[in-house]
Regions:
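Hydrophobic core of transmembrane alpha-helices in multi-pass small-molecule transporters
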Residues: 30, 102, 113-128, 324-344
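Symmetry-related core transmembrane helices of the 12-TM Major Facilitator Superfamily/SLC fold
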Residues: 180-198, 396-412
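Cytoplasmic helix-loop-helix junction between adjacent transmembrane helices
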Residues: 118-158
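C-terminal transmembrane helical hairpin of 12-TM major facilitator-type secondary transporters
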Residues: 297-345
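Residue-level signature of mid-helix packing/kink "hotspots" within the transmembrane helices
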Residues: 69-77, 161-162, 276-284, 377-378
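Helix-loop boundary and gating motifs at the non-cytosolic
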Residues: 8-70, 224-272
Length: 422
């Protein structure tokens, strides 16, 4: 490497908030994320095959996602405690354990209840790892580079969401769901090997003092309390549609537009990929714009608004397309682009949270923040499954948008109050 090349590479790494620790985290998150995306987007379709009823599949889906959110609440808090007391390396290693157990259950079982139990375990790698990633970014990356560092992490999480659904759709349509699980289980093995190799460069955690939860709650900044309360509304609306959108689109294309099932499955996979490609295109430019802005609040508010718009768009856009003689897939593609644009403010929101807590308690505080959020909205998918069966998916999705708009309005009011106080 020449002298001229070295500063250029160092500058690029610094510009992106990259160093050894953050690169190790990116690799681990990327592998585990790809593993999840290969199977999770097709879980509702697999349950539909197993139960033989779209309503039963919706009920199981609601139960699974409610249990997942409840367990995630504990996972975030436990992950924060591990990262605080034992360090990020151990927290990242432990995050792969429940996923591995879940895969073994899913591969061995055929009962919808066993599938539900295994899938809940499989989705809980992220809450165990999130406090560690915040701790690493907060301690290893300068404050003026944290938004871009979170944007790079978001890209690394989104890349699997682009590749995974395409791989999963091909596997599910060609062979069956067991192939999705087998591919995903293999990716977990790759993640564990890379994790052991890459994270040995991370410094061990020094001695830390225990921090009571009541102290963290008492010292949580007012702005973060307001953000948390608004997020609860947003996540309630989001979870009314998140686990059900693939099932909704599949049923729409097959029953109303008479698509072949295999073609509809491929469409679901590619629509998810469109969402994630859209999000990928926004992360870096928006993150740099946020870094240069006086406040991240407008970007967060726009994100919340787009969260609220997606469910009602999923209901209305296909009808508009039919009325104007356009292919339904064009309307669905536009809707999923809107769904991808809602990630505009995610790096800004994460940077706001990371900057809001002092370094000594950051990992534990982030775990508590995420945990409280998960506890608050964990019933949402269960309620959505109930409403789907009682009043239908269209009405359920409209209710989701109303809840999201309530959260957006509350954040707009509370952020103005926070701006006046700052």
């Amino acid at each position: 490497m020449t002298t001229a090349q070295k500063p250029l590479k160092e500058t690029a790494a610094q510009w992106l908030g990259l160093n050894r620790a953050t690169v190790a985290v990116l690799v681990v998150i990327g592998c585990l994320g790809l593993s999840e995306e290969v199977w999770s987007n097709f879980l509702a379709l697999h349950l539909n095959d197993r139960t033989g009823s779209i309503l039963r599949a919706a009920e199981y889906t609601g139960l699974i996602y409610s249990a997942t959110n409840l367990l995630e609440g504990f996972g975030y808090i436990i992950g924060g405690r591990i990262a605080h007391s034992m360090g990020a390396r151990l927290a990242l290693a432990i995050s792969a354990v429940p996923m591995s157990i879940g895969f073994m259950i899913m591969l061995a079982a055929d009962s919808p209840w066993a599938i539900a139990f295994g899938s809940v375990l499989m989705t809980n790698w992220e809450p165990l790892s999130v406090p560690a990633t915040f701790d690493i970014v907060g301690s290893e990356v300068p404050k003026n580079r944290r938004t871009i560092a979170f944007a790079v992490q978001s890209i690394q999480k989104r890349l699997p969401k682009v590749i995974g659904p395409a791989i999963g759709a091909a596997a599910f349509a060609a062979i069956g769901y067991w192939l999705n699980l087998t591919i995903a289980f293999g990716l977990v093995g790759v993640a564990v090997v890379l994790q052991l190799f890459l994270t040995n460069r991370m410094q061990p955690k020094g001695k830390t003092s225990p921090v009571p939860f009541r102290t963290i709650m008492r010292d949580m900044p007012r702005e973060l309390r307001m953000l948390l309360s608004a997020e609860v509304f947003i996540r309630w609306g989001d979870w009314f549609v998140r686990g059900f959108s693939g099932l909704y689109v599949l049923n729409l294309l097959i029953t109303e537009y008479h698509w072949e099932k295999s073609s509809a499955i491929y469409a679901v996979g590619w629509l998810v990929a469109i969402t994630n490609l859209t999000a990928l295109a926004t992360y870096i430019p928006i993150a740099k714009l946020v870094d240069r802005s006086k406040s991240p609040r407008p970007f967060i508010g726009l994100t919340f608004l787009l969260f609220a718009v997606f469910p009602v768009s999923l209901v209305m856009m296909p009808r508009f397309a039919t009325a104007f003689g356009l292919p339904v897939i064009v309307a669905l593609g536009f809707t999923y682009v809107v769904n991808g644009l809602r990630e505009l403010g995610e790096p800004a929101r994460k940077a706001l949270i990371a900057n809001g807590f002092p370094p000594a308690v950051r990992a534990r505080a982030v775990g508590l923040y995420w945990g409280l959020r998960s506890f608050a909205f964990f019933p949402a998918p269960l309620v959505a499954g109930y409403l789907w069966a009682r009043i239908g998916p269209d009405a359920t999705f409209v209710i989701a948008s109303v809840i999201g708009l309530m959260g957006t309005a509350w954040y707009a009011v509370s952020s103005k109050a926070a701006a006046r106080l700052s």
